[in-house]
């Protein structure tokens, strides 16, 4: 997330970062704020799955973004609820999907001696 913000700024791309939203307390919110970007917490554990997803959808649509980037976001979103946003969402995943989806991606790649690895 920090790299995305810094790269866009370094190349002076016409991008406004509206918010960084996390589902758990994390350093990403602090780093976003340090870069002058709104950092928000929607605590998934406290809200529960359904309320969390509804609140996240409401928050995102309130911003009316041109693009939504999911980076380091370890939640499978409700397809029905988020279908309206699918054409503006990018999910950055640390593997060449569909291989090695889920947690511990890099360790599993190493354990299986895979020669080719990347991001989707």
Segments from the language model and where they lie:
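One-carbon transfer enzymes
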Residues: 1-120
């Amino acid at each position: 997330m920090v790299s995305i913000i810094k790269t866009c700024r370094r190349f002076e791309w016409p991008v406004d970062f509206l918010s960084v939203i996390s589902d758990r307390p994390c350093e990403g919110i602090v780093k976003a704020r340090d870069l002058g970007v709104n950092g928000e917490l929607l605590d998934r554990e406290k809200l529960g799955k359904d309320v969390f997803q509804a609140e996240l959808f409401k928050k995102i649509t309130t911003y009316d973004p041109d693009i939504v980037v999911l980076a380091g976001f370890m939640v499978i979103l409700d397809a029905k609820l988020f279908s309206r946003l699918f054409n503006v969402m990018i999910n950055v995943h640390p593997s060449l999907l569909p291989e090695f989806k889920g947690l511990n991606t890099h360790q599993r790649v190493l354990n299986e001696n895979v020669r080719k690895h990347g991001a989707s």
